[in-house]
A protein has these predicted regions:
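Positively charged n-region of N-terminal signal peptides that target proteins for export
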Residues: 1-5
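Bacterial N-terminal signal peptides
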Residues: 8-18
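A residue-level marker of the well-folded mature domains of exported/periplasmic proteins
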Residues: 21-228
């Protein structure tokens, strides 16, 4: 996982470098935060990639993945530096879209990663195929529960594209291939392990016959694991 995330970060900066066709660039990164190992590893990979490419970067993020207003402020601060480009993992696909438009109007190229925005402005989007990931999670969980029974979803942040797409991919695959599996309504944990654990406990108490639960990100999965 750590190696993959280093490669992921390198591809982000390489993508931006090829997009703006310059060297010695300033390419700030606004992530979703620092609270999960994933983001810590992406930070290290970003810094390593910038060094390798000869570019300057900074890495910031909000206190947690619910702080949309804080992330907006961080993006505004980054744009005020007049960078060559900006890399953004958006907490909310709609709320961050206007800032991407603003960046573009100022000549700042934007690459989104992990979770994008509802805009065609970004020059590239670097991420896993979240719907496919959700579908593959559905196949794996269906195999574990014998393709029948109730299953739940503990997703991370409502409004973020990765949570939406992973959940949609999971639900669509269950409907398509596993008619004997009932998917319970999605519950959101804000990516917080404690909240995810509490949501999981509530789900199990309300559905004592539940067969399995899908956690859509690191924090959600840790919470589910702690609960069961």
């Amino acid at each position: 996982m750590r190696t993959r995330n280093f490669v992921y970060a390198l591809s982000l900066l390489a993508c931006m470098t090829s997009s703006v066709l310059a060297k010695d660039m300033n390419l700030p990164v606004v992530s979703k935060g620092f609270q999960h190992e994933f983001w810590q590893t992406v930070k290290m990979g970003t810094e390593a990639a910038a060094k390798e490419l000869g570019d300057k970067t900074s890495y910031v993020g909000p206190a947690d993945e619910t702080q949309i207003a804080e992330q907006i402020q961080l993006v505004e601060t980054a744009m005020a530096q007049k960078p060559n480009g900006l890399l953004l993992a958006a907490l909310d696909a709609n709320a961050l879209a206007p800032l991407v438009e603003t960046a573009n109007s100022r000549g700042i190229k934007v690459v989104t990663f992990d979770s994008g925005v509802n805009s065609d402005i970004p020059v590239s989007f670097v991420a896993t195929n979240n719907r496919k990931a959700g579908a593959e999670a559905a196949d794996a969980l269906a195999a574990e529960v014998g393709s029948k029974g109730k299953v739940g979803i503990i997703a991370h942040v409502a409004g973020t594209s990765s949570a939406i797409e992973r959940s949609e991919g999971f639900i669509a695959r269950m409907k398509e291939k596993y008619p004997d599996i009932q998917v319970l309504p999605v519950q959101y944990s804000d990516g917080d392990p404690q909240k995810a654990m509490d949501k999981t406990i509530d789900m199990i108490q309300a559905n004592p016959d539940i067969a399995g639960i899908y956690g859509t990100n690191e924090g959600s999965t840790l919470g589910v694991a702690n609960a069961i």
